[in-house]
Amino acid sequence: MADESLHTVPLEHNIDYHIVTLFERLEAMRKDSHGGGHGVNNRLSSTLQAPKRSMQAEIRTLEFWRSIISECLASFMYVFIVCGAAAGVGVGASVSSVLLATALASGLAMATLTQCFLHISGAHINPAVTLALCVVRSISPIRAAMYITAQCGGGIAGAALLYGVTVPGYQGNLQAAISHSAALAAWERFGVEFILTFLVVLCYFVSTDPMKKFMGNSAASIGCAYSACCFVSMPYLNPARSLGPSFVLNKWDSHWVYWFGPLVGGMASGLVYEYIFNSRNRNLRHNKGSIDNDSSSIHSEDELNYDMDMEKPNKYQQSQGTYPRGQSNGNGGGQAAGNGQHQAANMGQMPGVVANAGQGNYCQNLYTAPPLSSKYDQQQEPLYGGTRSLYCRSPTLTRSNLNRSQSVYAKSNTAINRDIVPRPGPLVPAQSLYPMRTQQQQQQQQQQQQQVAPAPQSSHLQNQNVQNQMQQRSESIYGMRGSMRGQQQPIQQQQQQQQQQQLQQQQPNMGVQQQQMQPPPQMMSDPQQQPQGFQPVYGTRTNPTPMDGNHKYDRRDPQQMYGVTGPRNRGQSAQSDDSSYGSYHGSAVTPPARHPSVEPSPPPPPMLMYAPPPQPNAAHPQPIRTQSERKVSAPVVVSQPAACAVTYTTSQGSAVTAQQQQQQQQQQQQQQQQQQQQMMMQQQQQHYGMLPLRPN
């Protein structure tokens, strides 16, 4: 394998990270369903529930501007109601009446406005609440700044409207402040604003928390908190409420106290609730820590097993050879033992077992291969070599592991074997789909050699049948005709012509008349048309032109391919069915004249196709077949362009003496021996167009 290195996946693209996030969100939804039985809690502000977005994208949203408008309108109504209640009591009213009117108006107004605008903007209606939410990162800084601006603007607008509609004699108590509060020092008033604002903001956080299980309505809780705090020396509790009357009446005495006290108290309340009293964050941190511990323990266990697997082959490599699982450096044993002790201590395991692993006394597990007891033992692969768990690293794959299960679409090794040079040796023909029974053909050949003809008139026909059967053995079932029918090697033509001349000289007294057309002299004498090299087995036959003299040979019937003449040609021959089996009839329109005095020329031998060489020896010869059986399995002989009509006539009535029969039998045996020798020479000269079989 070219590359066996392990690649780690980043945390953002790891499936474990997404699974943990999914479980966290499901837990939040479950807690929302359990604690959300009230309508106000289910309609929390989108500022607390919306996902984090960039400030530029947040400004472009409609929800952002709707929230700002709702905060401005709520602050306007709150300042107008609270300051109007204090001013309505009158200038000479008692302190208790002013305090009661202001506290009730503040609590009821805040409860009503919270119920109206909680699902839109969160119903802050107080810069201290907005700043506390910004500190704990519940809202963005740009939203907090816009909220505070809208709240201050709404407060100024409410105070201005109230100042305009108030009777001139009742404008003195417009600030809704008790007269004795002026006797207190600045730091005393700062402490009162800090403590009371801390309580109000804490009540807001608890009431609007969707994870908190409580009894009652969030709007009522917030209103009660404002009312209770207003009964204590009537503080402002809201910088926007102090800014509006001060701006309209132009009274700025110790105005910084009413800004810094509520803002600092609100920020302190938000931080305390977020990091101390917020159950959601505590559960989230606890779950995240437990998940990290579990994953770290799983990682440590897998790394421990992996390091042990990497270490053990390194020990046995020194004495028993290499190990196919992986490689490690020289310090792998010490590091694995040290890491194993540390990780085992974190997981609560026995460090002694892991420490002994570096010394060889380790515990066998399912994923490791047992050590080799001797050099004769074969190396065994682990029972399961895949990924052991969701969090562990896969072991280094080897070629042996890949050979276990190969896919259907596995890459073949044809490209590898393509460049391999075949081994030297004898050429072995490829095995055909249909088996070529060479042994049976050899047995038939031996039987035909031992067969003796009963009558002299059929001796030449029997020799022709032997040639046809020999031609059948030399042809393959996938054989095709060559591109030039009349081309053969000169040596084979000369040998076959000599054979035919000897046959004609040895049978001068037989009553057989043969007539054969001579081929054109240009085909026999032209050396360019004769093949000079190897003739391809799968050649394509070229169609002759109409002006060519060979076009008459292309009009043969399909029956003439097998050397059998049709019914229309049988009338021209006086032979029987058996004798006409081996006769060849040309495709000429007019039969040639018969001249017994002219010495016939030997016919061209049939073209030999590709075939495996027959074995010389046969164990069991088959029984002799008759002429009718040989007629059924008609041999296929490809006729040459120079072939012409040949007819044989036998004189069955002529008396033959026993001496002539013996001479003919001797001649036939000599001819058969010569034919066998010539066939062996031809087979040695044949070329095969097959490559040797490649080794697997």
UniProtKB/Swiss-Prot annotation:
Motif (NPA 2): 238-240
Comp. bias intervals (Pro residues): 599-616
The keyword Transmembrane helix is assigned to this record: yes
Protein name as catalogued: Neurogenic protein big brain
Keyword tags: Developmental protein, Differentiation, Ion channel, Ion transport, Membrane, Neurogenesis, Phosphoprotein, Repeat, Transmembrane, Transmembrane helix, Transport
Transmembrane segments: 72-93, 98-118, 144-167, 190-208, 214-234, 257-273
Gene name of this polypeptide: bib
Source taxon at top rank: Eukaryota
GO molecular function, one term: channel activity
Post-translational changes noted in the entry: Phosphorylated at its C-terminus.
Residue span of motif NPA 1: 126-128
Regions of compositional bias (Low complexity) in chain numbering: 439-451, 462-472, 487-532, 576-587, 659-686
Residue list for modification Phosphoserine: 46, 300, 394, 576
Coiled coil: none
Extracellular topological intervals: 94-97, 168-189, 235-256
Effect recorded for residue 71 to N: Loss of transport activity
Membrane topology qualifier: Multi-pass membrane protein
Region entry Disordered, spans: 314-345, 436-634, 650-696
Result for mutant: residue 274 to Q: No effect on transport activity
UniProt record similarity statement: Belongs to the MIP/aquaporin (TC 1.A.8) family.
Biased composition range(s): Basic and acidic residues: 549-558
Domains: entry comment: Aquaporins contain two tandem repeats each containing three membrane-spanning domains and a pore-forming loop with the signature motif Asn-Pro-Ala (NPA).
InterPro entries: Aquaporin-like, Aquaporin_transptr, MIP, MIP_CS
Any further remark recorded for this protein: Separation of neuroblasts from the ectoderm into the inner part of embryo is one of the first steps of CNS development in insects, this process is under control of the neurogenic genes. Mutation in bib gene underlies 'big brain' development defect.
Entry keyword Transferase: no
Stretches in topological domain Cytoplasmic: 1-71, 119-143, 209-213, 274-696
